[in-house]
Amino acid sequence: MKLSIILRICLWFMGISMAFPSLSQTMLVTNGNTSSRIILKENNQISWTAANLLQTFIQKVTSCKLPVVISQTPRKGDILIGGQSPAEVTEDGFSISTQDGILKISGKENGVVYGVVTLLEQYLGIDYWGENEYSLAPSKTVNLPLINKVENPGFRYRQTQCYAIHTDSIYKWWNRLEEPNEVFAAGYWVHTFDKLLPSFIYGKEHPEYYSYFKGKRHPGKASQWCLSNPEVFEIVAQRVDSIFKANPDKHIMSVSQNDGNYTNCTCDACKAIDDYEGALSGSIITFLNKLAARFPDKEFSTL
């Protein structure tokens, strides 16, 4: 008897769901027809990038081209791009939801585009491999389930040496990639020692600013620093401050050594730090920690 009652209840709920699919679904395209619109909350470049990407791939799947409009009141079945993100969304993070039958994708910085990519991957089953190389299953119907998703990147900066990012913007967006000039203040990205402490300015009069090994100091364009020298720290800190002030829209900079094996400073003070930390990276990490303490609202990368 109990089993019969439970079965009847389950069948009743299934009937409700089938009779009223809009209670659990957001219908974008049905049998090759659509009244859905892509609505931009803000008329800016990142919103247009997200909208164009979504429009392109929904059309590839369904042959339906959804119109893109700006600042209109959404109705059921519409897609809202942009707007306020939940508090837990961080830089380049995003939110996807299908509340009230409306698909909403918002994010911070590039996050709204990454939200579109995630929707296309996880809910429409699209894979993008490279320029004009993608896989998808054509369908005349696109119905989305209930979605309430927030995602933030595990890494603040994401880069690859694949040259496709220069010729294929979709590949770049799809793989959530960035380029140094987009993120790092004044393009200060890897091997920045001689930019921050130019040897042609300081090398001749202050060889003590540069690494000591094999019995002497080695100032030069490819030299490392004497990272325990307090004057070096102050000069670099002032230089970093001026760069950030000249680039107020950026908050990341690379303070990173030059290439070269066994060219690190082995003066008594630097060696003591490295010995204490148990690695040759000890002195550079100690230096960067001091720099991070001086600029608590900034971020630093190194090699």
What does each of the following model-derived ranges do?
Residues M1-L11:
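Bacterial N-terminal signal peptides that target proteins for export
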Residues K60-T73, E299-T302:
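Short, well-structured beta-strand/strand-turn elements
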Residues S35, N43, A50-L53, F57, ...:
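Feature activates predominantly on carbohydrate-active enzymes
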Residues P21-T26:
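Boundary at the C-terminal end of the N-terminal hydrophobic targeting segment
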Residues M27-R37:
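Immediate post-signal peptide segment of exported/extracytoplasmic ligand-binding proteins
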